C-alpha cells in the first residue's frame, strides 16, 4: 500500500516535470527562431508570430500564457493532465486548441515515473535506502532535459547543445552515486569498463559524424550518447545493446514515418535519432535487472 501511494505521488511529480519540460521546449524554440532571425536566416513567419511572445519579456516576468491570445494562465489552468482534460485541450479564453504534445507528455511522464519508482524503489524488505532515494531523485531530474530533447528533436530534428550537457552532467552524478554505493567503489576495472563503453557507442558515432559531415549521425547524437551510457550498468555489453536497440528503434521510426506519409523508405532518409536513443535507453534502464541476470548466465 505504501509503495502504491508513493508511486502515485512520484507519478504526479512526473506529470509536473513533463509540463515544465514542454514549456521549456517552446521557449527554446522561440529563442532559436529569434537567433536565426537576427542572423538573417529565413524562418517560418507563422511559427515566429506564435512564439515570439516567449522572448519578448524578461525571465523574471515570464508567465505561462496562451500562445494564441496571450491569456495568462491561472494556477488551476496549470494542473497537469486534469486541466487539459477539463478544458478539452483548449484555451479557457479564446478556445484555441492547445495541442496534444502537452497532454501526451504529461501522461507519459506520469506513467514513466511510476514505472521507474517501482523498478528502483528505495523501499525494500531491508528498510529504507537513502542511497536508493538519492539515485532515484537524480534520475527523475535527468528526465527533464531528456524529455526536452526527445520533443525538440522529434519536432525540429535538432538537439539543443546546452540541454545535452545539462543532462550529461546529471547522468554523470547518477553514475558517481551508483558507484559510491558499491563494495569495491571506484577501481581500475570500473574505469576500464566505462572507457570501453564510451568507445563502443559515443566514439563510434563521433567518428561517423565527422566522416559523413553529420549526414549519417548528427553532431548532438554522439554527445547525448555519453550521458546515456552513464545511466546504464557499467558493463560494455550494455553499450552494445544500446547501439543495436537505438538503431532498431530508429528503423521502426522510419517505417512509421513512411507509413504516415504514404512513401517508401528511401536510402539516406533522415530521421531524428535522439528520440530513438532515448527510448532505447529507457527500455534498457527498465529491464536492466533482467538483462544483468541474463548476461551473467550466458557469459
Model-derived features: positions:
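A membrane-topology feature that recognizes alpha-helical transmembrane segments
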Residues: 1-299
